[in-house]
């Protein structure tokens, strides 16, 4: 809140123009002095008292402005007061201009609380990281040796608690940053000045509506001149003399534009708007903005830009830049980020719980990248004090950036719970709605999911789903149900997928582990151990495998994201998504960019699903009469017995510019580089932009195979009118050899299934063997329970498969299979054919489990005389714990193969039974062959 000299000390908001003005500003950037001071131990009632409690010394250090102090030799954990000092002179020419107006000291951003003292006079303070502020210093400025002192307190634990400020999420990503992190300058304002502007397009009336907020010192007429440039040419010019009252006046203008060139993602055309105000015949102030003419609204579930449906394909940006800590990337970095994102098919960046620098918005306007601005309210301590801060700081923030045409969505906080009451959020929503356009929502993530409000203030639905692929369908069927009121439905963040950090390369770049990778203790205490990654992978003898782990985790991450995005694109009422996240951070490696700013995936691979028009596949529904009624049956869609027919339904999600009338489907089935089948179909699509429809069902005959075989199915959609491919995609399927009916009947297998996981015994692999219930008279035991009696049998020579999918004889932990981990396959005959990919892909879809054995539990099982050997392992991508899915345990004369894998499927939309899970059935077959010693 800004205190101004010459006014009573009430909080006054001034949203200054960021245009050119009449006079060039004096830049105060560069070298400053700083002292780092710890306040004495005393009870303070206010930040002003804390700032006043320190005593300056002669011990000044050098620091650069703008920038955070954490990157300039000051401990990231320092929470005292940073006292900045700068001496500056005013040039003769500039000083002579002072009589023509008022002089202001302008700060574009200080984190987070600043008290400003000029020439020994305390001129006020301001709280708020993200918004600019200024002070009138006309009566204090001197021609020579002005002394400027700024006392700064950053958010933390001591004086400005994180949850009582609007620090956003960066303190939880790494830590709160402190200092004068944006430029500082001195500007002159004459007697009339443009304080604020709101720009709104009406594309149906071909109008550009301007709302100007003009301040003047007295009541008088003023000439206002508006010029709109199309390139270098003057498109229109309008001048009007208007009577302005003393103080701030709101002046409205409508500019009629013939055949306007609209701004869009593919054609981000910008006009240049120049506004001049005169005092008599003299120019008093000047404002220049680049403006894009566009309209954002929604119809049903579709988001429309200039009346055209747009499918949101966003990336979540937390503002993490390790070299600067504060989110102040260079222009080069911003352009590179946006260019790479567009190349990968993204059309939106969600700036999550922070406000990027002005240059980011400028470049997004220029390059056609949509922006979702999420304002920085995160797990707040809600009381009247924080509410007052939110109202005032949001007013400042929104007014400072609302003119950018790239901003189309606003959210006012993230995952707020029941402490954020209806009246507060309703007031906030209405305030922001009155300040800007676009789609607005009070709570990203939805109060429905976090115990918050159900009567939300929202122009769209917004959910944050983080889960394994088998659970997405049930979530979507419930949360995106057709009975809900029709409006856009977005994933405000979702689909994170951690990869293994290339920690050795990170050390090579920094010379050591970077400071930011160590736990901080400021925000949330995450269960992460990146600082111990080398220690833990070395202790598990995985150090030599690090390059393999990094690559395999990236490959698996792409599979995961492709699975999830393809499913999301098949729902007509889902309007888009934001993927978590932009780049790897101190708390997660789920970025699509790694620590070095490199895209983890080939762009064309992401574009297969992340484009305006996407082709996906869906499958037949199946039912079965069970216990007197029909029940839905789920079967594995990625694995088939050789010779099966595969029936993919071709589904198009079309958000391109053109109506698709006629198309050709071109498909191939490939074994490695060899095409073993292909075909094409002509279809009448009749797809308008914004539609999601099935366009065809294909039947593909698969070959007979003698070993596990991976096939690749590729589809291209060719628009016969446009004569171009508008979408293409690919999928992997696996074929398994047929198992002879009579070949294994001589082998007796005892099945002990107290957990009832093999309900379809007669239709499955078990029918190939001589099934018995006699433990003593069998060659192999398959059991879902383990006890001392069986342990004794094993010691005497029995060979056992023990399947434990929950609590049981061996201690287990519950952990996701797909997220936050990578699977490691050791050389073993029972997974031959399952280990060709070197990572767990869709082949493992209905084998995936949420249960792992701990090494400590397996050590206890093996005891002093036994030994266990890993076959399939889980390495956690965040804390690097190593757990087990499939192991071989030697006990005495016998052997146990123990597994937590789900041979019968059953989690989420995995297969409902072993007979519907070819991969599970064949893996079980290979385990049985190994236990029976059959080659």
Predicted regions and their residues:
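Accessory carbohydrate-binding/adhesion or oligomerization-edge regions at the termini
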Residues: 1-72, 151, 155-158, 231, ...
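Accessory beta-strand-rich segments of carbohydrate-active enzymes
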Residues: 18-19, 26, 30-39, 74-75, ...
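Extended acidic/polar, glycine-enriched regions
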Residues: 142-145, 213-297, 705-739
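Short alpha-beta junction capping motif
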Residues: 776-816, 893
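Beta-strand-rich binding/interaction modules
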Residues: 118, 207-242, 251, 273, ...
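Catalytic beta-strand/loop cores that center a nucleophilic Ser/Cys/Thr
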Residues: 808-812, 818-926
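Active-site-adjacent substrate/metal-binding segments within catalytic domains
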Residues: 66-90, 97-107, 111-118, 124-127, ...
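Substrate-binding/catalytic cleft of secreted carbohydrate-active enzymes
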Residues: 338-339, 348-597, 781
